[in-house]
Amino acid sequence: QESYLALMDRFQKAGIPIAVAVLDMNWHVTDIPTKYGSGWTGYTWNKKLFPEPEKLLATLHAQGKHVTLNVHPAAGIRPSEVQYPEVAKAVGIDPASKQPVLFDLNNRKFIQAYFNLVHHPLEKQGIDFWWLDWQQGAARSRAQIDPLWSLNVLHFLDQVKEKKDQALILSRYAGPGSHRYPI
């Protein structure tokens, strides 16, 4: 956190304009128990690197910057996340079971929990928009749409609810038609 803010100060002193502060995947905890998979997916602030995330976000906003977080949502919400108990309950999983909440855009309960219990609280802390990253392949069957395409649509529409014509997401290319939503 200190070094990130120091970097922003260096840019400002050098006269280099920065409008968006981007936090790649190390913003969240990546060192998770191996039984839950890799650390690519995560939603719990890494307090070793960012001990006071709200203060960081407030400082960046005070400098006139917008803030985006990089997310790789494919692994869903695992028991290692602070949001896990609430999300598990919301989708009908007993949190004591430690069963991961699978990423499933065909499940309305998951979609509601994903936005309302995971993303919106981070937005309330000061996240302005999301950098959606998906490297886990296309749909699970030929009849389904690429998950990244669906994810982009859902995130963009969610942003429109709050930000109207200021809605924005960043994403990889998700195939034909995907240019409608991300940059």
Model-derived segments and spans:
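Catalytic-domain carbohydrate-binding cleft regions of carbohydrate-active enzymes
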Residues: 1-183
